[in-house]
Amino acid sequence: MANTKSASSAAKNKKPAAKPEKKAPAEELVKEEKVLVEAAAATAAPEAPAPEVKEEAPAAPIEVVAPETEAPQEEPAPEIKVEEKKKILFVASEAAPFIATGGLAEVIGSLSKALAKEDRYDVRAIIPLYQDIKKEYRKDFRFIGNIFVPLSWRNQYCGIFEYVKDNVTFYFVDNEYYFKRPGCYGYYDDGERFAFFCRSVMEILGFLNFYPDILHCHDWQAALAAIYLKTIYCFRPEYQFIRAVFTIHNIEYQGQYSLDILEDLFGISYRYQYLVEYDRCINLMKGAIECCEQFTTVSPTYAGEIKDPYYSHGLDPIVRRNEFKLCGILNGIDPDYYNPETDRALFANYNAEDTAGKAVCKEELQRMLNLPVKPETPIIAMITRLVSHKGLDLVKEVIEQALRQDIQFVLLGTGDSMYENYFSDLARRYQGKVVSIISFNSDLSRKIYSGADIFLMPSKSEPCGLSQMIASRYGTVAIVRETGGLRDSISPYGAGGNGFTFHDYNAYDMLYVINEAIGVYHNKDEWKRLMYKAMTTDFTWAKSAKYYEGLYLGMLMH
């Protein structure tokens, strides 16, 4: 209560607040401001006199100039991004022109060259450094280093050589224990030799710091490269984006070995046995089919045939299971090498427009082989390996009936002793009509291609075949059985095609077509037209390479 009273009495005794003082008159304020301004001016720099203002006509619109520091800079030219070349590496057991035992070498040499002509690709190839590689090339190989390659429990020396040809970089894997031997194949330890080769390929990529976009492996000898990529190297970051393609050149040769050596010799863990096991053994071709992103064959027809037990040599279930990633691309030939207009091995040169030189080639071939020089007599030629699937049993059955006509027969090749002996005996019994040369020589083969009139190729199976293309290129009309690449490259005369064909594997069907071809041969105008058709058929790699480009680019998009 006391506190309340004192508070109220204080409120009563409180004086009202004082009113604000009146402002000074305006004159006094102006005077005070003038004094302050004069004091400031005394300490400042003297001010420049104000410019005299003159009345002028209305000025034009004033151009506003940005400060110098804000002047717009000239835009730099847009940066042109150069697309990095796609990197392609071919892995194979042979390559032309260094060493060749068959069509595989031609494919590696010619396909790589065709792709390298496109500036979009960095194309390289790798093969073993065999003892028999041609000295004319080997002397220029450049040694670029060596590594030690892990092969299961051991490390093996690997030398690396390099050679550039036709814009393709070739690498050669050197190990004298494995490769300093005559020839390429046929040794008891071929499995170990090519396991070392494939493991070396994968290690060399790291040594070169070259990780291809496409790893293209060919036949069973290179199959382990695709298998190693899937089972060992895909876990390394540099290898993760490599895409593997596997090409079957001949499904008959699959690389089959005992399961016991999977880990001890090949260095592959048994947990991956399911990838390579087939019919209770290691099957390297099966393993490559399972491990690659795409697999191909060397002709569209052969791609269909290998799904059939008749052609697949037991592998058709694997092919059918993986057919979603299978395609067939027809091989080609090198038009620069196989060119009758420039080929120095020929007795005379010619082309599709002027075939006079071919008549000279025929006459000189007859002289060289000690055959009667008879321009009107057709020469039927075979250049082949002497093995059963080349249709030689058909030839044996009807050749003597064909020889009753006015023809000459020339054979060049080596192979099974049974066929070598048969054709050698045939030449002895038909002297002046038959010549059998049991050997092989590239220059001689081109002399025969150019000097013969008809080329006989009645194969039981033929994944692609190059001989029928080469013969056609030289104006020698082909007779083929409709199988594999023969069907894809030679079309029947009766349908306006570039050769003669028969469907069933039957000797008398073949004899009928031989007689048909001989009949057309004696109609010179019609034969000349058929020769022109054969010589102008496009068998070049340029066309085939386009299909491979499409395959590669499709893989890289996924």
Which residue ranges define each predicted feature?
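Catalytic cores of nucleotide-sugar-dependent glycosyltransferases that transfer UDP/GDP/TDP-activated
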Residues: A2-K15, K19, K23, P61-H558
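N-terminal intrinsically disordered, low-complexity tails
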Residues: S9-E68
